[in-house]
Amino acid sequence: MRAFIFDEAGTGKTKRSMDLLDGAEHILVICPASVVKTAWLPQIGQWSYGKALTIEDYRKIGWPEDYRFLVVSYNMAAKLGEVPDGFSLIVDESHMVKNPRSGRSKTVKGISDLAKDVLMLTGTPAPKDLEDLYGQTVVMYPHAKDRTALLGDSWRTLGTFRMRYGKPYTMNVQGRLVVKYTYSKPMVEEACRQLQKLVLDIRRGGNPLPQVEWLPSPKTEQEDVAFEQWTNTHQLAEDVYAASASAAAVKLAQLDDGFAYKTEDRGESYWFGVSKLKTVYSEAKRREDPTPLLVWTRFKAVRDEIYRTWTPCTDAKTFLAMTGQERGKYRLIVANPQSMGTGVDGLQHLIKDQIWLDLPWTYADWEQANRRLVRRGSPYQGQQRILVPDTPWNRKVMDVIEGRKTLDDIVKEKQLG
Protein backbone atom coordinates (compact mmCIF):
# COMPACT_ATOMS: atom_id res chain seq x y z
CA MET A 1 0.00 0.00 0.00
CA ARG A 2 1.28 3.45 -0.98
CA ALA A 3 -1.09 6.33 -0.33
CA PHE A 4 -1.49 9.94 0.74
CA ILE A 5 -3.50 11.01 3.78
CA PHE A 6 -4.54 14.64 3.24
CA ASP A 7 -6.99 14.84 6.16
CA GLU A 8 -7.59 18.22 7.78
CA ALA A 9 -5.83 19.17 11.01
CA GLY A 10 -7.40 17.68 14.10
CA THR A 11 -9.07 14.73 12.37
CA GLY A 12 -6.59 12.09 13.52
CA LYS A 13 -4.09 11.55 10.68
CA THR A 14 -1.59 9.99 13.08
CA LYS A 15 -4.01 7.43 14.47
CA ARG A 16 -5.41 6.67 11.02
CA SER A 17 -1.97 5.89 9.64
CA MET A 18 -1.22 3.50 12.50
CA ASP A 19 -4.60 1.80 12.10
CA LEU A 20 -3.92 1.23 8.40
CA LEU A 21 -0.60 -0.41 9.24
CA ASP A 22 -2.01 -2.48 12.10
CA GLY A 23 -0.58 -5.68 10.66
CA ALA A 24 2.91 -4.32 9.97
CA GLU A 25 5.74 -5.85 12.00
CA HIS A 26 8.05 -2.83 11.78
CA ILE A 27 7.15 0.80 11.11
CA LEU A 28 9.58 3.64 10.44
CA VAL A 29 8.17 7.12 11.10
CA ILE A 30 9.93 10.16 9.61
CA CYS A 31 8.61 13.45 10.97
CA PRO A 32 9.66 16.97 12.02
CA ALA A 33 12.05 16.96 14.98
CA SER A 34 9.59 18.98 17.07
CA VAL A 35 7.02 16.17 17.14
CA VAL A 36 9.16 13.06 17.68
CA LYS A 37 8.76 13.09 21.45
CA THR A 38 5.83 15.49 21.85
CA ALA A 39 3.39 13.80 19.45
CA TRP A 40 4.50 10.54 17.87
CA LEU A 41 5.86 8.65 20.87
CA PRO A 42 2.85 9.51 23.10
CA GLN A 43 0.35 8.68 20.34
CA ILE A 44 2.04 5.38 19.55
CA GLY A 45 1.56 4.48 23.20
CA GLN A 46 -2.05 5.65 23.13
CA TRP A 47 -3.28 4.27 19.80
CA SER A 48 -1.06 1.38 18.77
CA TYR A 49 0.95 -1.49 20.20
CA GLY A 50 4.59 -2.50 20.40
CA LYS A 51 7.68 -0.71 21.67
CA ALA A 52 9.15 2.38 20.01
CA LEU A 53 12.68 3.73 19.83
CA THR A 54 14.26 7.00 18.64
CA ILE A 55 17.38 7.69 16.61
CA GLU A 56 19.39 8.03 19.83
CA ASP A 57 18.42 4.47 20.79
CA TYR A 58 18.99 3.23 17.24
CA ARG A 59 22.56 4.53 17.12
CA LYS A 60 23.34 2.55 20.27
CA ILE A 61 21.53 -0.74 19.70
CA GLY A 62 20.24 -0.70 16.11
CA TRP A 63 16.64 -1.74 15.50
CA PRO A 64 15.99 -4.82 17.66
CA GLU A 65 13.41 -7.31 16.42
CA ASP A 66 11.14 -6.71 19.41
CA TYR A 67 10.82 -2.96 18.73
CA ARG A 68 7.95 -2.24 16.36
CA PHE A 69 8.43 1.51 15.78
CA LEU A 70 11.44 3.66 14.99
CA VAL A 71 10.68 7.40 15.02
CA VAL A 72 13.26 9.74 13.47
CA SER A 73 13.33 13.36 12.37
CA TYR A 74 13.90 14.46 8.79
CA ASN A 75 17.32 15.79 9.78
CA MET A 76 18.41 12.45 11.23
CA ALA A 77 16.93 10.19 8.56
CA ALA A 78 20.21 10.24 6.64
CA LYS A 79 21.88 8.59 9.66
CA LEU A 80 19.88 5.40 9.24
CA GLY A 81 21.73 2.22 8.35
CA GLU A 82 20.23 -1.25 8.49
CA VAL A 83 16.47 -1.59 8.77
CA PRO A 84 14.30 -4.72 8.97
CA ASP A 85 13.18 -6.32 5.73
CA GLY A 86 9.61 -5.50 4.76
CA PHE A 87 9.30 -2.45 7.01
CA SER A 88 6.50 0.08 6.50
CA LEU A 89 7.12 3.83 6.23
CA ILE A 90 5.08 6.79 7.51
CA VAL A 91 6.17 10.23 6.27
CA ASP A 92 4.57 12.88 8.49
CA GLU A 93 4.14 16.46 7.22
CA SER A 94 5.09 15.15 3.79
CA HIS A 95 5.02 18.63 2.23
CA MET A 96 8.51 18.88 3.72
CA VAL A 97 9.72 16.62 0.90
CA LYS A 98 8.03 18.59 -1.87
CA ASN A 99 11.27 19.58 -3.61
CA PRO A 100 12.70 16.55 -5.46
CA ARG A 101 16.09 18.28 -5.78
CA SER A 102 16.59 18.76 -2.04
CA GLY A 103 18.81 16.50 0.02
CA ARG A 104 15.93 15.83 2.41
CA SER A 105 13.69 14.58 -0.40
CA LYS A 106 16.44 12.42 -1.87
CA THR A 107 17.08 10.81 1.51
CA VAL A 108 13.42 9.98 2.14
CA LYS A 109 13.00 8.85 -1.47
CA GLY A 110 15.81 6.33 -0.99
CA ILE A 111 14.18 5.01 2.18
CA SER A 112 10.79 4.83 0.47
CA ASP A 113 12.32 2.69 -2.27
CA LEU A 114 13.14 0.04 0.36
CA ALA A 115 9.75 0.09 2.12
CA LYS A 116 6.90 -2.34 1.65
CA ASP A 117 4.17 0.20 2.50
CA VAL A 118 4.35 4.01 2.38
CA LEU A 119 1.85 6.44 3.90
CA MET A 120 2.48 10.16 3.44
CA LEU A 121 0.58 12.52 5.75
CA THR A 122 -0.03 16.26 5.43
CA GLY A 123 -2.87 18.70 5.87
CA THR A 124 -1.19 21.10 3.41
CA PRO A 125 -0.35 19.02 0.34
CA ALA A 126 0.53 21.98 -1.90
CA PRO A 127 1.90 24.87 0.20
CA LYS A 128 3.24 26.74 -2.83
CA ASP A 129 1.87 25.34 -6.08
CA LEU A 130 1.05 22.17 -8.00
CA GLU A 131 4.70 21.15 -8.27
CA ASP A 132 4.66 20.40 -4.54
CA LEU A 133 2.35 17.46 -5.27
CA TYR A 134 4.65 16.18 -7.99
CA GLY A 135 7.62 16.30 -5.61
CA GLN A 136 5.84 14.26 -2.94
CA THR A 137 4.72 11.72 -5.54
CA VAL A 138 8.37 11.20 -6.52
CA VAL A 139 9.08 10.23 -2.90
CA MET A 140 6.11 7.85 -2.80
CA TYR A 141 7.02 6.24 -6.13
CA PRO A 142 10.78 6.71 -6.64
CA HIS A 143 10.81 5.03 -10.07
CA ALA A 144 9.39 6.90 -13.06
CA LYS A 145 7.96 3.72 -14.58
CA ASP A 146 5.80 3.17 -11.50
CA ARG A 147 4.53 6.77 -11.50
CA THR A 148 3.68 6.70 -15.19
CA ALA A 149 1.91 3.35 -14.87
CA LEU A 150 -0.40 4.88 -12.26
CA LEU A 151 -0.66 8.53 -13.26
CA GLY A 152 0.37 8.79 -16.90
CA ASP A 153 3.47 9.93 -18.76
CA SER A 154 3.05 13.54 -17.57
CA TRP A 155 4.31 12.44 -14.16
CA ARG A 156 7.55 10.92 -15.50
CA THR A 157 9.77 13.95 -14.81
CA LEU A 158 9.32 17.50 -13.57
CA GLY A 159 9.83 18.64 -17.15
CA THR A 160 7.01 16.49 -18.54
CA PHE A 161 4.81 17.55 -15.61
CA ARG A 162 5.39 21.22 -16.39
CA MET A 163 4.81 20.69 -20.10
CA ARG A 164 1.43 19.07 -19.46
CA TYR A 165 0.01 21.18 -16.66
CA GLY A 166 1.99 24.43 -16.55
CA LYS A 167 2.28 27.61 -18.55
CA PRO A 168 5.79 29.10 -18.78
CA TYR A 169 6.67 32.73 -18.23
CA THR A 170 9.97 34.55 -17.77
CA MET A 171 11.10 36.87 -15.02
CA ASN A 172 14.30 38.76 -14.34
CA VAL A 173 16.18 37.32 -11.37
CA GLN A 174 19.27 39.32 -10.47
CA GLY A 175 19.94 40.33 -14.03
CA ARG A 176 19.16 37.07 -15.80
CA LEU A 177 15.99 35.68 -17.32
CA VAL A 178 14.54 32.66 -15.56
CA VAL A 179 11.65 30.51 -16.78
CA LYS A 180 8.90 29.94 -14.22
CA TYR A 181 5.60 28.08 -14.49
CA THR A 182 2.08 29.02 -13.48
CA TYR A 183 -0.79 26.54 -13.16
CA SER A 184 -4.33 27.44 -14.17
CA LYS A 185 -7.33 26.21 -12.22
CA PRO A 186 -8.41 23.70 -14.94
CA MET A 187 -4.91 22.20 -15.04
CA VAL A 188 -4.77 21.99 -11.24
CA GLU A 189 -8.11 20.20 -11.25
CA GLU A 190 -6.95 17.77 -13.95
CA ALA A 191 -3.73 16.93 -12.08
CA CYS A 192 -5.64 16.45 -8.83
CA ARG A 193 -8.07 14.08 -10.53
CA GLN A 194 -5.12 11.94 -11.56
CA LEU A 195 -3.54 12.08 -8.12
CA GLN A 196 -6.84 11.08 -6.51
CA LYS A 197 -5.89 7.48 -7.27
CA LEU A 198 -3.27 7.74 -4.53
CA VAL A 199 -5.27 9.76 -1.97
CA LEU A 200 -7.37 8.10 0.70
CA ASP A 201 -10.81 9.58 1.38
CA ILE A 202 -10.18 12.96 2.96
CA ARG A 203 -11.56 13.46 6.45
CA ARG A 204 -12.65 17.00 7.18
CA GLY A 205 -13.05 18.61 10.54
CA GLY A 206 -16.53 19.92 9.84
CA ASN A 207 -15.75 23.23 11.54
CA PRO A 208 -15.57 26.13 9.05
CA LEU A 209 -13.04 28.83 9.80
CA PRO A 210 -14.60 31.94 11.38
CA GLN A 211 -15.06 35.04 9.25
CA VAL A 212 -12.01 37.31 9.46
CA GLU A 213 -12.49 40.38 11.65
CA TRP A 214 -10.51 43.39 10.40
CA LEU A 215 -9.25 45.61 13.22
CA PRO A 216 -8.61 49.32 12.49
CA SER A 217 -4.85 49.90 12.37
CA PRO A 218 -4.19 53.35 10.87
CA LYS A 219 -0.56 54.20 10.24
CA THR A 220 0.95 57.48 11.37
CA GLU A 221 2.35 60.03 8.93
CA GLN A 222 5.82 59.19 10.26
CA GLU A 223 5.31 55.53 9.36
CA ASP A 224 4.16 56.41 5.84
CA VAL A 225 7.22 58.61 5.32
CA ALA A 226 9.58 55.98 6.71
CA PHE A 227 7.99 53.32 4.52
CA GLU A 228 8.59 55.45 1.41
CA GLN A 229 12.19 56.12 2.44
CA TRP A 230 12.94 52.45 2.91
CA THR A 231 11.34 51.40 -0.37
CA ASN A 232 13.16 54.13 -2.30
CA THR A 233 16.55 54.77 -0.69
CA HIS A 234 17.22 51.11 0.05
CA GLN A 235 16.68 50.12 -3.58
CA LEU A 236 13.80 47.79 -2.82
CA ALA A 237 12.52 47.97 -6.38
CA GLU A 238 15.88 47.13 -7.94
CA ASP A 239 17.26 44.65 -5.43
CA VAL A 240 14.23 42.83 -4.08
CA TYR A 241 11.65 43.01 -6.84
CA ALA A 242 14.23 41.65 -9.26
CA ALA A 243 14.99 38.66 -7.03
CA SER A 244 11.57 37.07 -6.68
CA ALA A 245 8.01 37.86 -5.75
CA SER A 246 8.34 36.02 -2.44
CA ALA A 247 11.52 37.92 -1.48
CA ALA A 248 9.81 41.21 -2.23
CA ALA A 249 6.70 40.16 -0.32
CA VAL A 250 8.76 39.28 2.75
CA LYS A 251 10.39 42.71 2.69
CA LEU A 252 7.07 44.48 2.22
CA ALA A 253 5.54 42.48 5.09
CA GLN A 254 8.38 43.56 7.37
CA LEU A 255 7.90 47.20 6.39
CA ASP A 256 4.16 46.88 6.97
CA ASP A 257 4.89 45.54 10.46
CA GLY A 258 6.96 48.69 11.08
CA PHE A 259 10.57 47.55 10.88
CA ALA A 260 13.44 46.74 8.55
CA TYR A 261 16.62 44.77 9.10
CA LYS A 262 19.73 46.95 9.07
CA THR A 263 22.09 44.16 8.09
CA GLU A 264 21.90 41.20 5.73
CA ASP A 265 22.36 38.71 8.57
CA ARG A 266 19.20 40.15 10.20
CA GLY A 267 21.11 40.65 13.41
CA GLU A 268 19.81 44.17 13.98
CA SER A 269 16.47 45.74 13.13
CA TYR A 270 15.29 49.34 12.87
CA TRP A 271 11.76 50.11 14.08
CA PHE A 272 10.02 53.12 12.58
CA GLY A 273 6.41 52.37 13.52
CA VAL A 274 4.36 50.33 15.97
CA SER A 275 0.78 50.91 14.82
CA LYS A 276 0.18 47.19 14.18
CA LEU A 277 1.68 46.24 17.54
CA LYS A 278 -0.54 48.84 19.21
CA THR A 279 -3.54 47.20 17.53
CA VAL A 280 -2.55 43.88 19.10
CA TYR A 281 -1.95 45.43 22.51
CA SER A 282 -5.27 47.31 22.44
CA GLU A 283 -7.11 44.09 21.67
CA ALA A 284 -5.30 42.27 24.49
CA LYS A 285 -6.03 45.03 27.01
CA ARG A 286 -9.74 45.33 26.31
CA ARG A 287 -10.43 41.59 26.30
CA GLU A 288 -12.77 40.38 28.99
CA ASP A 289 -12.26 36.77 27.93
CA PRO A 290 -10.03 34.85 30.38
CA THR A 291 -8.13 33.08 27.58
CA PRO A 292 -5.01 34.72 26.13
CA LEU A 293 -4.71 36.06 22.59
CA LEU A 294 -2.51 34.08 20.17
CA VAL A 295 -0.35 36.37 18.00
CA TRP A 296 0.94 34.99 14.69
CA THR A 297 4.13 36.45 13.23
CA ARG A 298 6.90 34.79 11.25
CA PHE A 299 9.54 37.45 12.02
CA LYS A 300 11.93 37.05 14.94
CA ALA A 301 12.35 40.83 15.18
CA VAL A 302 8.62 41.20 15.82
CA ARG A 303 8.56 38.43 18.42
CA ASP A 304 11.55 40.01 20.18
CA GLU A 305 9.86 43.42 20.16
CA ILE A 306 6.69 41.96 21.69
CA TYR A 307 8.71 40.21 24.40
CA ARG A 308 10.47 43.52 25.10
CA THR A 309 7.37 45.72 25.23
CA TRP A 310 4.70 43.40 26.69
CA THR A 311 5.14 41.37 29.85
CA PRO A 312 4.49 38.68 30.69
CA CYS A 313 4.61 37.02 27.29
CA THR A 314 5.77 33.62 26.07
CA ASP A 315 5.69 31.34 23.05
CA ALA A 316 2.96 28.78 22.37
CA LYS A 317 4.99 25.65 23.10
CA THR A 318 6.23 27.00 26.44
CA PHE A 319 2.69 28.05 27.34
CA LEU A 320 1.36 24.59 26.52
CA ALA A 321 3.90 22.97 28.85
CA MET A 322 2.92 25.16 31.84
CA THR A 323 0.59 24.28 34.68
CA GLY A 324 -2.87 25.84 34.77
CA GLN A 325 -1.83 28.19 37.54
CA GLU A 326 1.22 29.38 35.60
CA ARG A 327 -0.84 30.04 32.45
CA GLY A 328 -3.30 32.31 34.26
CA LYS A 329 -1.10 35.43 34.15
CA TYR A 330 -0.61 35.48 30.36
CA ARG A 331 -2.69 37.67 28.03
CA LEU A 332 -0.50 37.35 24.92
CA ILE A 333 1.03 34.21 23.42
CA VAL A 334 3.35 34.50 20.41
CA ALA A 335 3.75 31.87 17.69
CA ASN A 336 5.51 31.44 14.35
CA PRO A 337 3.09 29.86 11.83
CA GLN A 338 6.02 28.38 9.90
CA SER A 339 7.13 26.21 12.82
CA MET A 340 3.82 25.30 14.45
CA GLY A 341 3.23 21.61 13.80
CA THR A 342 1.54 18.86 15.73
CA GLY A 343 3.86 19.61 18.65
CA VAL A 344 1.24 22.10 19.83
CA ASP A 345 -1.73 19.75 19.81
CA GLY A 346 -3.81 20.72 22.83
CA LEU A 347 -3.58 24.47 22.30
CA GLN A 348 -7.19 24.41 21.07
CA HIS A 349 -8.31 23.66 24.65
CA LEU A 350 -6.58 26.76 26.07
CA ILE A 351 -6.90 29.55 23.49
CA LYS A 352 -9.81 30.56 21.29
CA ASP A 353 -8.81 33.84 19.58
CA GLN A 354 -5.91 34.52 17.23
CA ILE A 355 -4.55 37.64 15.55
CA TRP A 356 -2.30 37.78 12.49
CA LEU A 357 0.34 40.51 12.36
CA ASP A 358 1.64 39.33 8.98
CA LEU A 359 -0.14 36.88 6.70
CA PRO A 360 1.16 33.82 4.82
CA TRP A 361 1.10 33.66 1.01
CA THR A 362 -1.05 30.54 0.57
CA TYR A 363 -4.44 29.32 1.72
CA ALA A 364 -2.81 26.05 2.79
CA ASP A 365 -0.52 27.82 5.28
CA TRP A 366 -3.36 30.08 6.41
CA GLU A 367 -5.69 27.17 7.09
CA GLN A 368 -3.10 24.95 8.73
CA ALA A 369 -2.17 27.62 11.27
CA ASN A 370 -5.77 28.62 12.02
CA ARG A 371 -6.66 24.95 12.47
CA ARG A 372 -4.34 24.78 15.45
CA LEU A 373 -7.27 26.34 17.34
CA VAL A 374 -10.32 25.80 15.13
CA ARG A 375 -10.46 22.04 15.32
CA ARG A 376 -12.27 19.08 16.77
CA GLY A 377 -12.17 18.90 20.56
CA SER A 378 -12.07 22.64 21.19
CA PRO A 379 -14.50 23.73 23.94
CA TYR A 380 -14.91 27.05 22.10
CA GLN A 381 -16.73 25.81 18.99
CA GLY A 382 -18.54 28.71 17.35
CA GLN A 383 -16.84 31.25 19.62
CA GLN A 384 -13.38 31.49 18.03
CA ARG A 385 -12.22 34.70 16.36
CA ILE A 386 -9.62 35.32 13.66
CA LEU A 387 -8.39 38.93 13.79
CA VAL A 388 -6.24 40.83 11.28
CA PRO A 389 -4.96 44.44 11.51
CA ASP A 390 -6.56 46.32 8.62
CA THR A 391 -3.67 47.60 6.50
CA PRO A 392 -3.49 47.91 2.69
CA TRP A 393 -0.76 45.25 2.57
CA ASN A 394 -2.71 42.75 4.67
CA ARG A 395 -5.76 43.31 2.43
CA LYS A 396 -3.67 42.57 -0.65
CA VAL A 397 -2.20 39.40 0.85
CA MET A 398 -5.70 38.23 1.80
CA ASP A 399 -6.59 38.56 -1.89
CA VAL A 400 -3.77 36.10 -2.60
CA ILE A 401 -4.86 33.70 0.15
CA GLU A 402 -8.42 33.68 -1.16
CA GLY A 403 -7.33 33.26 -4.78
CA ARG A 404 -8.33 36.63 -6.21
CA LYS A 405 -4.74 37.62 -7.04
CA THR A 406 -1.27 36.09 -7.22
CA LEU A 407 1.79 37.07 -5.22
CA ASP A 408 3.31 38.47 -8.41
CA ASP A 409 0.23 40.67 -8.89
CA ILE A 410 0.42 42.38 -5.52
CA VAL A 411 4.20 42.78 -5.56
CA LYS A 412 3.96 44.56 -8.91
CA GLU A 413 1.48 46.96 -7.31
CA LYS A 414 4.25 48.93 -5.64
CA GLN A 415 1.85 51.61 -4.52
CA LEU A 416 0.33 50.11 -1.37
CA GLY A 417 -2.01 52.94 -0.44
Model-assigned labels for residue ranges:
Residues 70-90, 96-110, 335-345:
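Conserved RecA-like ASCE ATPase "motif II neighborhood" in helicase/translocase motors
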Residues 35-59, 140-144:
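Conserved helix-turn-beta segment of the N-terminal RecA-like "Helicase ATP-binding" lobe
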Residues 2-19:
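Walker A/P-loop
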Residues 73, 303, 312-397, 403-404:
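Conserved RecA-like P-loop NTPase helicase motor core
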Residues 3-4, 8, 94, 100-101, ...:
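Interdomain linker/hinge connecting the two RecA-like lobes of the SF2 helicase core
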Residues 16, 23-46, 127-132, 298-301:
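Conserved Walker A/P-loop ATP-binding site and its immediately adjacent core
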Residues 51-76:
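Inter-Walker segment of RecA-like/P-loop motor cores
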Residues 88, 105-204, 378-382:
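Conserved P-loop NTPase motor "coupling/switch" region that bridges the ATPase
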